[in-house]
């Protein structure tokens, strides 16, 4: 029994604005099903004596101090934009 249906794959593709064929949907359904099966196998692993961790490695990200600085002049920023108005960059609408 498949853990994910072709309809669910097509729905997710639609939400991501991806056009996929029926053959691709079937292929992705098989691939996602095998990924989900593998993830379910992890639930069977005995982790009784494993202490919880948030990072596998002991490395840490060391960030520099965030120092506010003066930005670029608006004129310099908008001169490279293909379309701008009143100091704002105009972009095509992506929402219906």
From Swiss-Prot:
Known catalytic reactions: L-glutamyl-tRNA(Gln) + L-glutamine + ATP + H2O = L-glutaminyl-tRNA(Gln) + L-glutamate + ADP + phosphate + H(+); L-aspartyl-tRNA(Asn) + L-glutamine + ATP + H2O = L-asparaginyl-tRNA(Asn) + L-glutamate + ADP + phosphate + 2 H(+)
InterPro entries (alphabetical): Asp/Glu-ADT_sf_sub_c, GatC
Pfam families, per the entry: GatC
UniProt-recorded Gene Ontology molecular function terms: asparaginyl-tRNA synthase (glutamine-hydrolyzing) activity; ATP binding; glutaminyl-tRNA synthase (glutamine-hydrolyzing) activity
Swiss-Prot/TrEMBL GO biological process terms: glutaminyl-tRNAGln biosynthesis via transamidation; regulation of translational fidelity; translation
Residue ranges of coiled coil: none
Disulfide bonds: none
Assembly notes: Heterotrimer of A, B and C subunits.
EC number(s) from the headed UniProt entry: 6.3.5.-
Family: Belongs to the GatC family.
Protein name, as recorded: Aspartyl/glutamyl-tRNA(Asn/Gln) amidotransferase subunit C
Function description: Allows the formation of correctly charged Asn-tRNA(Asn) or Gln-tRNA(Gln) through the transamidation of misacylated Asp-tRNA(Asn) or Glu-tRNA(Gln) in organisms which lack either or both of asparaginyl-tRNA or glutaminyl-tRNA synthetases. The reaction takes place in the presence of glutamine and ATP through an activated phospho-Asp-tRNA(Asn) or phospho-Glu-tRNA(Gln).
Keywords: ATP-binding, Ligase, Nucleotide-binding, Protein biosynthesis
Species for this entry: Bacillus licheniformis (strain ATCC 14580 / DSM 13 / JCM 2505 / CCUG 7422 / NBRC 12200 / NCIMB 9375 / NCTC 10341 / NRRL NRS-1264 / Gibson 46)
HAMAP family: GatC
């Amino acid at each position: 029994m498949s853990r994910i249906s072709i309809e669910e794959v097509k729905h997710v593709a639609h939400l991501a604005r991806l056009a996929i064929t029926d053959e691709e949907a079937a292929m992705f359904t098989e691939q996602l099903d095998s990924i989900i099966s593998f993830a379910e196998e992890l639930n069977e692993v005995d982790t009784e004596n494993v202490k919880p961790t948030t990072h596998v490695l002991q490395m840490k990200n060391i960030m520099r101090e965030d120092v506010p600085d003066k930005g670029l002049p608006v004129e310099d920023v908008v001169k490279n934009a293909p379309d701008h108005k009143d100091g704002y960059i105009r972009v095509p609408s992506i929402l219906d």
